[in-house]
Amino acid sequence: MLTLPESLRDAFKEPLGPVTIDADELLAAAAETRGERAAPDAPIIAVGDVVTYHLREAGRVPDVALIDGKTERETVDAEIGSALAAADDRRLSVENPAASLSAELLEALSEALSDADPVIIEVTGEEDLAALPAILAAPDGASVVYGQPGEGMVRVAVTPESRTEARELFEALDGDVEAAYKALGRVPDGDR
């Protein structure tokens, strides 16, 4: 549905938020954002196996987790793979090619965000670009957490400002952006 053009690859290397290696610090910042935005139930969305694992190890099961069994295109180590496989969260399985956002992934993300219980979206392919639609679909006060290769975890506080930045990148992808918004259950200019 949407693909990352070669000309935009560098734009996606810059983190969309602060980077940390401390899951407890990240969770404290997420709680602060929920308080500031008067959104005590705002979700935490984790994009990536290692990020999901670290949040779970810190005692916070992500409301939505997107995993693909890989980190930096290599299979995650056995400890992480086993821990995530043992999680008893509801699971959705989708296919999503590398450097892409499939309708299947976008629809699953929308469905998972509407579920009151934690959901793991298991991706065959890659989930690397999923932070963008997660930022667009999540409510104000949510946190989207993804891995920054070689650096740590990036936390994006979902606000109108971060949604605008994500929207600009999302709309710069190649493909049918209107259909992608529809699959995500959003209108192009609509903040939550």
Curated annotation (Swiss-Prot):
Catalysed transformations (reactions): 3'-dephospho-CoA + GTP = GDP + CoA + H(+)
Paired cysteines (S-S): none
Q: In which pathway does it act?
A: Cofactor biosynthesis; coenzyme A biosynthesis
On whether GTP-binding is a keyword of this UniProt record, the answer is yes
Which GO molecular function annotation, any one, does this entry have? kinase activity
Gene Ontology BP terms:
coenzyme A biosynthetic process
This entry's Enzyme Commission designation comes to: 2.7.1.237
Q: Name one Pfam family in it.
A: DUF359
Q: What does this protein do?
A: Catalyzes the GTP-dependent phosphorylation of the 3'-hydroxyl group of dephosphocoenzyme A to form coenzyme A (CoA).
> What is stated as this protein's family in its record?
Belongs to the GTP-dependent DPCK family.
What protein does this entry describe?
A: GTP-dependent dephospho-CoA kinase
Record keywords, A-Z: Coenzyme A biosynthesis, GTP-binding, Kinase, Nucleotide-binding, Transferase
Q: Name the residues that bind GTP.
A: 49-51, 68, 70, 127
